[in-house]
Amino acid sequence: MRHRMWIFSALLTLFATGCAVNNNYLRPEDFADYLRRDGIRVESVRKVPPDPFRASDAAAVKVADSEIGVYKYDTTAGAQRRRLKWIENEKRLYINGIPYPVRIYGSFVFFGLERNPAKRKILRTIEKFN
């Protein structure tokens, strides 16, 4: 019985690591390149301070006259990994106590998608961002 449990837990661990998204090596600015490759017109890309959301890096990508915040959390650092896990559970970030919905994919949090006219296309690109 113990042998079966060990095999089951080993297979479960193998499956979980195989399904995880590993995009920690990418930069927030790289997301703009992925959008362009998918035929989405990127109007501008600029660095923004990552401090408000305690991220390690951040950029604002303008698509369809609307900016998307792309925040990277370095998952090799324990504090960043815990913060990202908290955001995954909450599915929102707060600015002055006001909650805003976010999308999480791998090491990245995407902010400001809800009102973007190209939201569906951008979401498809997010799923390829690794």
Predicted regions and their residues:
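Bacterial N-terminal signal peptides that target proteins for export
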Residues: 1-7
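C-terminal motif of bacterial Sec signal peptides marking the signal peptidase cleavage site
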Residues: 17-18
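Stable alpha-helical elements in mature extracytoplasmic
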Residues: 27-31, 78-82, 118-125
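N-terminal secretory signal peptides
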Residues: 30-62
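Sec/Tat-exported extracytoplasmic proteins
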Residues: 35-42, 77, 90, 126-130
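An anionic, turn-rich surface loop/hairpin at beta-sheet edges
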Residues: 52-53, 80-101
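A short acidic-to-branched-hydrophobic micro-motif
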Residues: 63-81
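A short, solvent-exposed beta-edge/loop patch
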Residues: 91-130
